[in-house]
């Protein structure tokens, strides 16, 4: 029996890719709590300059990831997803190591851009699992996989803050590089993939990729949905701590309260994503998507009227439970509407839209709060999500009518 005939243990691959996504999510978020402090340590002084450079080094990673994702997705469809996971984990480990050695802000900015160019572990993990798991378990598997990155992103800032306090800022980058190298080793030794490389001549061009989709218009609407989900999430991030301070008044533990309120949606998503993914496998991911979007609107609006931090925390927990269903539902619908031959590119295009949302969301939130106040951010975000719910419902209805 040739290696390509050996059956794949997709459950083991799911477990290993979950660990990989967890480590990647943790590695990315380990450095987030002190990013402005490291920028300052590299010689940037003055309030406005520090704000500008902190924003640049944060956003440039997502911008370059959005540009590079389609290229890596195409390469994954030609060479296989496992090799892309290995490339991403090792590339990010090397870049993180170099970040700890940066001597000035320009070196650090270039390395942050390289991090975006070489990233892509999580979308490739999604593509790998999507092409191996039975279709009737796609929602559960992708929902479960999504909790890996969320778990890492939740624990990362806490661990990063503690490590920075004990060892200083630069050593955290070296620790992060070690975490990513462990991710590389796990992928190398434990993930299995049967993949027949495709020559460049045999690869479908973009126009052929679109033509091969069961419903190109629906797939585009799913990309837009991913973008809007990230815009909605990111729009609240810049103002959350300031809004909590406005609600709490003069309290000594504002950082702890803000951190807790920032993390509760992730905890709720951890609990809800696999369960709602499994429910989506039974009743259809399109129903889960629309209901979760409507619930998100109904939870965002009262956030602009809360009077205490604990009211905000409760609403954000419920919002996290609904949000935990959104991206897995989108990914499951992408699986249903594409073939394994183009899965790498479809998931990479989706990642590009997600990265664009990661950049534009905080910009939108900051602009609205500067002009109209913190509470207006939640109302505008609710309006954006409502538009997305209507747009998604119309796209799904058109698909249903087309198949009847």
Swiss-Prot record:
Family named by the database record: Belongs to the major facilitator superfamily. DHA1 family. MdtG (TC 2.A.1.2.20) subfamily.
InterPro entries in alphabetical order: MFS, MFS_dom, MFS_MdtG_subfamily, MFS_sugar_transport-like, MFS_trans_sf, Mutidrug-R_MdtG, Tet-R_TetA/multi-R_MdtG-like
Keyword rRNA-binding part of the UniProt annotation: no
Keywords in alphabetical order: Cell inner membrane, Cell membrane, Membrane, Transmembrane, Transmembrane helix, Transport
Organism taxonomic ancestry: Bacteria, Pseudomonadati, Pseudomonadota, Gammaproteobacteria, Enterobacterales
SUPFAM superfamilies in the cross-refs: MFS general substrate transporter
Disulfide bond sites: none
Gene expressing this chain: mdtG
Locations listed in the record: Cell inner membrane
Family annotation (HAMAP family): MFS_MdtG
Signal sequence interval, chain numbering: none
The name this protein goes by in its record: Multidrug resistance protein MdtG
Superkingdom, taxonomy of origin: Bacteria
NCBIfam families named among the record's database cross-references: PRK09874.1 (NF007372)
């Amino acid at each position: 029996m040739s290696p390509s005939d050996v059956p794949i243990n997709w459950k083991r691959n799911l477990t290993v890719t979950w660990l990989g996504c967890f480590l990647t999510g943790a590695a990315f978020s380990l450095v987030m709590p002190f990013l402005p402090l490291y920028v300052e340590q590299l010689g940037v002084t003055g309030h406005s300059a520090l704000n500008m450079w902190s924003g640049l080094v944060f956003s440039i990673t997502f911008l370059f990831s959005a540009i590079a994702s389609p290229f890596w997705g195409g390469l994954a469809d030609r060479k296989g997803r496992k090799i892309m996971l290995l490339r991403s984990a090792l590339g990010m480990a090397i870049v993180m190591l170099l970040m700890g050695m940066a001597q000035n802000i320009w070196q650090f900015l270039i390395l942050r851009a390289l991090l975006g160019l070489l990233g892509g572990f999580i979308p490739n993990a999604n593509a790998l699992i999507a092409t191996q798991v039975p279709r009737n378990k796609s929602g559960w598997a992708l929902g479960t996989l999504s909790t890996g990155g969320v778990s890492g992103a939740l624990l990362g800032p806490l661990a990063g803050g503690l490590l920075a306090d004990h060892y200083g800022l630069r050593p955290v980058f070296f620790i992060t590089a070690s975490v990513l190298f462990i991710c590389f080793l796990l992928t190398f030794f434990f993930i299995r993939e049967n993949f027949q490389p495709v020559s460049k001549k045999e690869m479908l061009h973009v126009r052929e990729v679109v033509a091969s989709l069961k419903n190109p218009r629906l797939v585009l609407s799913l990309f837009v949905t991913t973008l809007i989900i990230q815009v909605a999430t990111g729009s609240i991030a810049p103002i959350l701590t300031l809004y909590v301070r406005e609600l709490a008044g003069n309290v000594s533990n504002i950082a702890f309260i803000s951190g807790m309120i920032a993390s509760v949606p992730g905890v709720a998503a951890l609990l809800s994503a696999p369960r709602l993914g499994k429910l989506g496998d039974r009743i259809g991911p399109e129903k889960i998507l629309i209901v979760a979007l409507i619930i998100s609107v109904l939870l965002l609006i009262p956030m602009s009227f809360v009077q205490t931090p604990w009211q905000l925390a409760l609403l954000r927990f419920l919002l996290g439970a609904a949000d935990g269903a959104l991206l897995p539902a989108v990914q499951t619908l992408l699986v249903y509407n594409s073939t394994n031959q183009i899965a790498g590119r479809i998931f990479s295009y989706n990642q590009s839209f997600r990265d664009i949302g990661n950049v534009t969301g905080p910009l939108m939130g900051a602009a609205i709060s500067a002009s109209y106040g913190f509470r207006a951010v939640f109302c505008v975000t609710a309006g954006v999500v409502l538009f997305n719910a209507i747009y998604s419902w119309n796209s799904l209805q058109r698909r249903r009518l087309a198949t009847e």
